Curated annotation (Swiss-Prot):
The keyword ATP-binding applies. It comes from Autographa californica nuclear polyhedrosis virus. Essential for initiation of viral DNA replication, it may contribute to other functions such as controlling the switch to the late phase and leading to the inhibition of host protein synthesis. Required for late and very late gene expression. The gene is HELI. This is DNA replication helicase. It is an enzyme of class 3 (hydrolase). It comes from the Viruses.
């Protein structure tokens, strides 16, 4: 019975290389074989095979296994056996192994069981209250199997084959009998999506010295004594070997998934000994074979290769060259002399190349400090003027003066100078001015002491312990400095600097990390008692490009670290995105490519989604056939019917752009026919295609209704002849129809072709209406199944159809544009032919999205030198910003740059990020994530008037020391408060409890997060100019599951919540932002620019207008009256008319203005009437309009000119604008 049914919906496959057994070529295809007849049938989707097993489990007897409410919930097979044994005749079908998706309960033929039964013990992998329970083995037909495994635990079938072969020399068939097989009985051996599975132990390592481990699933230390299983070739030419250990391990790590997904692995070769068990074809696993899509159907504008990036190199020159060289020489001599003082007791003190040796041995860690000090000495001369060429000459002369005799060291020094050569002179000078000049000691003296102490630490550490690594040898710490027992004067001037504020009496000492307030009884105070530097006005944390961190001094220009030093005055340790242990940066071109493709991403996801929907149709049609023809489960049949119908409705309701993309996927040859046959007659007759200057193809119009009918017939019908007839509805020219009828070999098409041509419009209208109104799509499929009855009924119904003429609105007028756009995406990105991007049953959204991006975007750039996991982390960080903004390109790019700018501790933007949005859209998670990465001060208060709700002194100091100031759920604030915190000038003097007053340079940037609209009293242009608005209206919802395509979630604006997702993003986001900081700085300022990124974004302009109309009567008035300045306006508007329209517009203010506006202004008693209701003074509003549009107002004639606006009540904008994204 099963044999007869399967032939109707499963493709027959031959025994050739495409479908060769043991050859892993497709992770989704499953082949079943009839051992009696040799027939092989293909399940194109694992989901179809699962549905097949679920349906036949109860052997056509009532509900399926899934919906049988009376079935036992135990993990054993006995209930199924007992129930099915009464009705089963048995079959001969087995499944050929596919280790990507097939896991089993262990089983073995009876003839082999006697060999292994004494040696099998699974209790090492499971705990049970019943000893021996997991090892219980029972007979089923010709087999023995272990039934008592947990539901989500399995055995890799490939691993089971290898285990039996390696341990016992047993070779088992690469097939698994299907439930109700004659030789097995009513036992289901298959396990889908196990949490863990047993496998032989594997280790994949490169053949480098030392080798790099790419994959392991156990803890054995593999060596040459272990057997090889696979040899893998990598993109950079490296060879990796996968070794196998015959012992079992229990893990969730699938080796085949790893090698399939790693874009740096290109070929996998099985060693000859195990070719009979498994072969892996990586190319076939990754790409569909039938991908010969003709992308040259239309001329594409973006066919040129990217031009190489060219950066001009300026030549070094200076009118002050002699002065620069002299100061360099004097400075180097002074630094050398003071280093000698520190190392006086060491034999290295006599080394004439002491400074050079220090730099080389320390790997130039603090070489930049020498640049800063010598430049500060140069610029102290008021007669010294300079430009970029002078700076370049200074850097080159400095390197040459130090390393003239050492070419390798010279090249390294010049390399260290490269970042500074890219900066403008103001930026370079600003960086050097970070170095504080303690005028009680000459700059070269203190730097010489600093270098000398550092070198002495190295010499001491290396003499004591030879096994320390480089960083440990050069660790510039409090403990290491103290252990040297150097003279106090040297130590205090070179490292432990002490400061005293003579105004407040506060003492601070550099503690090896940052400056801390000390008291007389503290050890640091006593250590520096006689070496105090007194200041009357000292500001801390006044830094931009260099600042103290837990890893040392961070340099924004080089994205690297120097040793901690006392010459940067800081009382806090800001966090940075770079860590000393990070891998090297991706190439700049590769990173910029990531950001540049952001604009294409929605189109990429949309194009993929079209293909995904078509595959789903195919899968659901097969499932529908399975549940209808092979089972009797009403629930399954209803579920499949609804699922297929929902998908049909989604396809039927596609917009024009998506319809054209769908047509390309479903029937690209017909689309090519449209392009050719709907051109003008001269172009159709031209052999080579369109005439060079003819643009007729841009005027091609397609009847939307006809196209929808054709696409549904192709997708939900299975008859080529009927499809050929229906596609004739697209074409109106008789030549095409007659040619089709001549070329066809179908009598059916010839019989009805003239009818379709003659009744063209009627047929379109009738079929469109029929399909549109059909209740369930399976009813349409039934109609298509009997084409002759379908045509008979169609002729009868069309005969009664009235004549119809289609309107212009029935056409897809932008056919060519949509077609060209779709082809452009398909030309650039392999979204329809890559198998790896297909969603897997175990995928969640972040996992799938990362894999998709790695394959479609990152595979297009050369990143062979980088590990797959490192690349994946950077991609995950990038995709976080995309998901958070619902893939809004402009908002995502701006937030990336804003977040990266937090690592530059100065508020240069004068902008506050305002994030209103729906609850559950991820706003809180955004600042919680940033809290892991930077110093964030968060203050929750719904009202900041500037006069109340002030924070405590400790919190004020915390805020001044922070990198990000976040206010959650701020409902109202004053104009003065907002400008104060969003402005760049934020110096302030504050003190912690029981500590003295200190002056700080506040460097935080402001973030406001709200669910409800914010009210700012006295809202004006200054307030408006300080806002960057990112609105979010999507939601992360518990009940939403990953739909297999991110575009589905983008459309619905509902995303699944993944537990612990944000915590796992800390490192990926940090690594990604480190790249933004490295490559996206403005060379003019050295800053990461973010405030102008939304300047031309239409959505941001709209959202800014929404905020303004909600807060300001003036902006509300401008919006309601639709006032616009237009140079060519011919009419003028008198002052009386303006006042009249203001009077009308004011009546709508209550709908536009924030509720807090009236309350606040009534309290201030501005324009308030005795009835305690707020009244707007129309004369005041008129004057505000005059001020706002002063360039369009003639004071002499009292008229407005070059302006358009609503001149009557009906033209007013009375619809309140809402935020959009």
């Amino acid at each position: 019975m099963i044999d007869n049914i399967l032939q109707f919906f499963l493709k027959n496959v031959p025994q050739d290389k495409t479908y060769e057994i043991n050859n892993l070529q497709d992770a989704n295809h499953l082949i079943i074989r009839n051992t009696r007849t040799g027939t092989r049938r293909l399940f194109e989707y694992v989901n179809n095979f699962q549905q097949f097993l679920n349906t036949i489990r109860n052997n056509f007897n009532g509900p399926c296994a899934k919906h049988d409410m009376g079935a036992s919930c135990e993990d054993t097979e006995e209930p199924a056996e007992k129930h099915a044994a009464q009705t089963l005749d048995g079959h001969d079908w087995v499944l050929e192994s596919n280790d990507f998706c097939i896991f089993v309960k262990p089983f073995i033929l009876k003839k082999h069981y006697d060999i292994i039964q004494k040696y099998i013990n699974f209790e090492d992998f499971f705990k049970s209250t019943d000893p021996g329970y997991i090892n219980k083995c029972v007979q089923a037909g010709d087999y023995y199997y272990w039934p008592n495994w947990p539901k989500k635990q399995a055995f890799s079938f490939n691993g089971w084959q290898l285990f039996l072969n390696i341990k016992f020399g047993i070779v088992i068939e690469p097939t698994i009998p299907i439930i109700h097989n004659k030789k097995l009985g009513p036992v289901d051996l298959f396990v889908f999506d196990p949490k863990c599975f047993l496998n032989v132990e594997l280790s994949l390592r490169t053949n480098h010295d030392p080798p790099q481990t790419l994959f392991v699933n156990g803890k054995t230390k593999f060596d040459d004594s272990h057997e090889d299983l696979f040899i893998l070739k990598m993109a950079d030419g490296t060879v990796a070997t996968c070794k196998v250990n015959g012992e079992l391990v229990n893990s969730d790590k699938n080796f085949f998934n790893y090698i399939r997904d790693d874009i740096n692995l290109e070929e996998c070769i099985t060693v000859p000994k195990y070719k009979h068990i498994v072969n892996v074809n990586l190319k076939s696993l990754r790409v569909f074979e039938n991908n010969n899509f003709d992308k040259n159907d239309v001329d594409l504008s973006d066919t040129r290769s990217r031009k190489p990036r060219i950066v001009p190199i300026i030549s070094a020159s200076s009118e002050n060259a002699d002065y620069i060289q002299t100061q360099i020489n004097l400075g180097l001599i002074a630094i050398h002399e003071n280093m000698v003082k520190v190392l006086a007791t060491h034999e290295r003190a006599n080394d004439p190349n002491l400074l050079q040796q220090y730099f080389e041995k320390s790997k130039f860690k603090n070489f930049d400090f020498l640049i800063y000090v010598l430049w500060k000495i140069l610029t102290k001369n008021e007669n010294f003027s300079y430009r970029e060429t002078d700076i370049k000459l200074f850097l080159e002369l400095l390197c040459e003066s130090l390393f003239a005799c050492d070419k390798e060291a010279l090249n390294e020094a010049l390399k260290r100078c490269e970042p500074y050569k890219k900066q403008e002179k103001i930026v370079f000078n600003r960086a050097c001015n970070h170095w504080f000049d303690f005028d009680d000691t000459k700059l070269c003296v203190s730097l010489g002491y600093y270098f000398g102490i550092h070198y002495m630490i190295y010499l001491t550490q290396s003499a004591k312990n030879e096994i320390l690594d480089h960083d440990e040898l050069w660790a510039y710490t409090y403990e290491n400095v103290m252990a040297l027992n150097l003279p106090p004067d040297i130590v205090c001037k070179g490292f432990f600097r002490k400061l005293e504020n003579v105004v407040t009496g506060v003492n601070l000492v550099f503690n090896g990390k940052h400056y801390q307030i000390v008291k007389k009884e503290d050890d640091l105070f006593k250590l520096t008692k006689s070496n105090c530097y007194k200041l009357s006005n000292i500001k801390f944390n006044n830094w931009k490009y260099l600042y103290l961190t837990t890893h040392g001094v961070y340099n924004v220009f080089t994205n690297s670290f120097h040793s901690s030093c006392p010459f940067l005055l800081g009382t806090t340790l800001p966090q940075t995105f770079k860590k000393p242990t990070d891998e090297k940066y991706l190439p700049e071109d590769a990173f910029n490519y990531m950001l540049s493709t952001s604009a294409d991403e929605l189109s990429i996801y949309r194009t993929y989604h079209i293909a995904k929907m078509c595959r789903d149709v195919k899968m659901l049609k097969t499932n529908t056939a399975i549940v209808n023809y092979m089972g009797n489960c009403n629930t399954c049949q209803a579920d499949m019917r609804v699922a297929l119908n929902n998908l049909f409705r989604d396809l039927w309701n596609l917009d024009d752009e998506n319809l054209i993309t769908l047509a390309l996927y479903v029937n690209k040859n017909r689309v090519s026919d449209m392009l050719h046959n709907l051109k003008c007659k001269p172009c159709r007759s031209t052999v080579s295609g369109s005439r060079p200057k003819c643009k007729c193809y841009k005027k091609i119009k397609i009847n939307r209704k006809a196209l929808k009918v054709c696409l549904m017939a192709d997708m939900f019908g299975n008859d080529a002849e009927l499809s050929e007839l229906i596609w004739m509805l697209i074409f109106t020219n008789k030549t095409y129809v007659s040619t089709t009828l001549i070329r066809t070999n179908s009598e059916f098409v010839n019989q009805h072709g003239e009818f379709f041509s003659k009744e063209h419009n009627k047929i379109i209208q009738y079929l469109y209406r029929t399909i549109h109104k059909i209740e369930y799509v399976d009813m349409l499929m039934d109609k298509f199944n009997d084409k002759r009855l379908f045509l008979t009924e169609l002729r009868d119904d069309v005969a009664r159809e009235p004549d119809v003429q289609f309107e212009e609105s029935d056409n897809i007028s932008k056919f060519y544009t949509h077609h060209a756009d779709a082809l452009m995406i398909l030309k650039k990105y392999n979204v329809w032919w890559d198998k790896i991007i297909l969603a897997r049953s175990t995928d969640d959204l972040p996992t799938w999205l990362t894999r998709f991006y790695m394959r479609i975007i990152m595979s297009k750039v050369d990143l062979k030198e980088y590990s797959y996991n490192y690349l994946k982390k950077i991609v995950e960080g990038y995709l976080y910003f995309k998901r958070f903004t619902n893939f809004n390109h402009a908002n995502a790019i701006m937030l990336m740059h804003f977040a990266a700018s937090l690592a530059i501790p100065v508020d240069y933007g004068k902008k506050a990020i305002y994030m209103p949005g729906e609850p559950g859209s991820g706003k809180s998670s955004f600042f919680e994530l940033l809290d892991y990465l930077v110093l964030m001060h968060k203050f929750d208060d719904d009202n900041h008037s500037g006069e109340s709700n002030k924070e405590t002194s400790d919190k004020e100091v915390s805020k001044l020391n922070s990198q990000l100031y976040t206010i959650n759920e701020l409902k109202q604030c004053s104009e003065s408060y907002f400008k104060k915190h969003a402005d760049s000038s934020k110096s302030d003097s504050k003190s912690r409890k029981y500590q003295g007053l200190l002056k700080y340079e506040a460097n935080y940037k402001m973030l406001i997060v709200n669910n409800k609209p914010l009210y700012v009293d006295d809202y004006d242009d200054g307030v408006q100019d300080r806002f960057l608005i990112v609105y979010t209206n999507h939601k992360f919802v518990d009940s939403v599951k990953f739909a297999g395509s991110v575009y589905e979630h983008i459309k619905s604006k509902q995303f699944p919540i993944e537990s612990m997702y944000y915590e796992s993003l800390v490192t990926p986001v940090r690594l990604f932002l480190s790249h933004v900081l490295m490559y996206r700085r403005d060379p003019k300022t050295g800053f990461v620019v973010y405030k102008t990124l939304l300047s031309n974004d239409p959505m941001h302009k709209h959202n800014l207008m929404c905020l303004s109309t909600n807060n300001s009567p003036l902006y509300a008035l401008i919006y309601i009256l639709n006032i616009k300045t237009v140079r060519s306006a011919t009419i003028t508007i008198g002052e009386d008319k303006m006042e009249e329209m203001i009077g009308i517009a004011v009546q709508h203010f209550k709908n536009f203005l924030h509720p807090s506006f009236v309350q606040y202004n009534y309290k201030k008693n501005i324009n308030a009437s005795s009835s305690k209701s707020f009244v707007f003074n129309e004369q005041v509003l008129l004057q505000q309009i005059k001020n706002k549009f002063k360039n369009n107002y003639n004071k002499t004639t009292n008229v407005f000119y070059n302006m358009t606006m609503a001149l009557n009540r009906n033209d007013l904008n009375t619809s309140v604008p809402n935020f959009v994204c």
